[in-house]
Amino acid sequence: MDASLSPDQLSFPAVWRHPHLLDLERLTAAEILAVLRTADQLKTMTEGCRRKVPLLTGKTCANLFFENSTRTRNSFSLAAKRLGADTVEFSSSGSSVAKGETFVDTAKTIEAMGVDWVVTRHSTPGTPHLLARELDCCVLNAGDGPHEHPTQGLLDMLTILQHRIGSDWKNEAADPEKVFAGMTVALVGDIAHSRTARSNLWGLRKLGAHVIICGPPTLVSHRWEELGFEVAHRLDEIVHRCDVLNLLRIQFERQKARPFPSVYEYAALYAMNGERLRLAKDDILIMAPGPINRGVEITPEVADGPHSVILEQVTNGIAVRMASLWLLANAKENADASAENLS
């Protein structure tokens, strides 16, 4: 991508018509690739000295987070600001939610202040879909319980593309369903409680990757086999086949009972360490959505080693969220204009 690319050269993809980003399961391969191409362009535009491009000046993004977040919340805020938009930061503690106000009423109150996007994270699956029905502004899912985390799935795929797939995927003639053809990606760890896993599973498969789901039987349902995914219960048996390992943390906060005898036993079977790295391909990519638990799903030598792209995932998160905000805003403006012309 030409580093001199300017904002007026950014073209809106005709395939994108969604005013909301709620999940990847219901997006097509072409729509997913459109977001990734836009993110790649915006990343280039905002690198180096030019940190901001005024594509969304005058608009406002509200972050309504009802669960803790470091990467996602700050990333959405930076994404909005780099495109010239303002942000509203909401925290459930100290708000009227503590007085009994409902989730939807809170969102409607924030919308009434004139916001253009609501970015929401909530422990209950489906809450972003509910808001999309209740609000007039754009809604982005920043994680709804164990259901999905679409921008995390997108940033993970963007990172893989930039490291493993040359530049052919940027060509409009590329077949979206074959972008990851021939590539094997393993998601390792707590699949049962991971919204990141679900977004990755749908997105990677739509773009042609072979996906392996690996983890303890208590955390990996055989339902995934019925849906056509490969399931494994021993990392040692698959690591040599993988082009990418995405290591998911154990989400103890979502579990009612411990799914294995001890953290030590889990690490012995599933942690990516130096010994397992020597069994892997020379160019394997090591990923993790964060936060990482050193010594549990990954050892420090691997997390900080040359195969790790964990911090690059964080960087790409800003690009993906810039693309998401821009695409949704334009799609809504186009839809509103069409509706006005018909009236």
UniProtKB/Swiss-Prot annotation:
<feature type="binding site">
    <location>
        <position position="195"/>
    </location>
    <ligand>
        <name>L-aspartate</name>
    </ligand>
</feature>
<comment type="subunit">
    <text>Heterododecamer (2C3:3R2) of six catalytic PyrB chains organized as two trimers (C3), and six regulatory PyrI chains organized as three dimers (R2).</text>
</comment>
<dbReference type="GO" id="GO:0006520">
    <property type="term" value="P:amino acid metabolic process"/>
</dbReference>
<feature type="binding site">
    <location>
        <position position="99"/>
    </location>
    <ligand>
        <name>L-aspartate</name>
    </ligand>
</feature>
<feature type="binding site">
    <location>
        <position position="291"/>
    </location>
    <ligand>
        <name>carbamoyl phosphate</name>
    </ligand>
</feature>
<dbReference type="GO" id="GO:0006207">
    <property type="term" value="P:'de novo' pyrimidine nucleobase biosynthetic process"/>
</dbReference>
<dbReference type="InterPro" id="IPR006131">
    <property type="entry name" value="Asp_carbamoyltransf_Asp/Orn-bd"/>
</dbReference>
<dbReference type="InterPro" id="IPR036901">
    <property type="entry name" value="Asp/Orn_carbamoylTrfase_sf"/>
</dbReference>
<comment type="similarity">
    <text>Belongs to the aspartate/ornithine carbamoyltransferase superfamily. ATCase family.</text>
</comment>
<feature type="binding site">
    <location>
        <position position="152"/>
    </location>
    <ligand>
        <name>carbamoyl phosphate</name>
    </ligand>
</feature>
<dbReference type="Pfam" id="PF02729">
    <property type="entry name" value="OTCace_N"/>
</dbReference>
<feature type="binding site">
    <location>
        <position position="71"/>
    </location>
    <ligand>
        <name>carbamoyl phosphate</name>
    </ligand>
</feature>
<feature type="binding site">
    <location>
        <position position="72"/>
    </location>
    <ligand>
        <name>carbamoyl phosphate</name>
    </ligand>
</feature>
<dbReference type="InterPro" id="IPR006132">
    <property type="entry name" value="Asp/Orn_carbamoyltranf_P-bd"/>
</dbReference>
<keyword id="KW-0665">Pyrimidine biosynthesis</keyword>
<feature type="binding site">
    <location>
        <position position="249"/>
    </location>
    <ligand>
        <name>L-aspartate</name>
    </ligand>
</feature>
<feature type="binding site">
    <location>
        <position position="149"/>
    </location>
    <ligand>
        <name>carbamoyl phosphate</name>
    </ligand>
</feature>
<dbReference type="InterPro" id="IPR006130">
    <property type="entry name" value="Asp/Orn_carbamoylTrfase"/>
</dbReference>
<protein>
    <recommendedName>
        <fullName>Aspartate carbamoyltransferase catalytic subunit</fullName>
        <ecNumber>2.1.3.2</ecNumber>
    </recommendedName>
</protein>
<dbReference type="GO" id="GO:0044205">
    <property type="term" value="P:'de novo' UMP biosynthetic process"/>
</dbReference>
<feature type="binding site">
    <location>
        <position position="290"/>
    </location>
    <ligand>
        <name>carbamoyl phosphate</name>
    </ligand>
</feature>
<comment type="pathway">
    <text>Pyrimidine metabolism; UMP biosynthesis via de novo pathway; (S)-dihydroorotate from bicarbonate: step 2/3.</text>
</comment>
<dbReference type="Pfam" id="PF00185">
    <property type="entry name" value="OTCace"/>
</dbReference>
<dbReference type="InterPro" id="IPR002082">
    <property type="entry name" value="Asp_carbamoyltransf"/>
</dbReference>
<keyword id="KW-0808">Transferase</keyword>
<comment type="function">
    <text>Catalyzes the condensation of carbamoyl phosphate and aspartate to form carbamoyl aspartate and inorganic phosphate, the committed step in the de novo pyrimidine nucleotide biosynthesis pathway.</text>
</comment>
<dbReference type="GO" id="GO:0004070">
    <property type="term" value="F:aspartate carbamoyltransferase activity"/>
</dbReference>
<dbReference type="GO" id="GO:0016597">
    <property type="term" value="F:amino acid binding"/>
</dbReference>
<feature type="binding site">
    <location>
        <position position="121"/>
    </location>
    <ligand>
        <name>carbamoyl phosphate</name>
    </ligand>
</feature>
